[in-house]
């Protein structure tokens, strides 16, 4: 079993914000593979589908971003998902808008959602698909990540979401995700 977790904040207030790029990718994967996130426990909403014979869990933690591990850790334990079978989709301010980067392991890099997952899984060796949201020019980090993409950024991000969906499912084909 593989688990793809999209990071974000719950609620309509945050739905289209930069910090919710992980949720946006999960939503598109759900649409593409006809998945309903109909399970609601472990402080998450999630659903599953089969991809080339492999069960894949799509997960949106319902904790706020900075406490995502509180949901991810118990879900992994319950479904016996190994750390090498986890892919986390996150925003990254250090990447230019729409750029994708797959990391096999590493520190949180200042991302509190990743820091929480590391704390709850006791490992840094899970894969992350980072999507660039660019560093704010003038606004504070909090204001930047909690605002929607502007008219110039939206088409770039929509393309990045499409690409992230492809990268996510390509990873599922690999033995170690």
Swiss-Prot record:
The keyword Cytoplasm applies. GO terms for molecular function: peptidyl-tRNA hydrolase activity; tRNA binding. It is found in: Cytoplasm. Its EC number is 3.1.1.29. Keywords: Cytoplasm, Hydrolase, RNA-binding, tRNA-binding. The record marks 9 as: Discriminates between blocked and unblocked aminoacyl-tRNA. Belongs to the PTH family. This is Peptidyl-tRNA hydrolase.
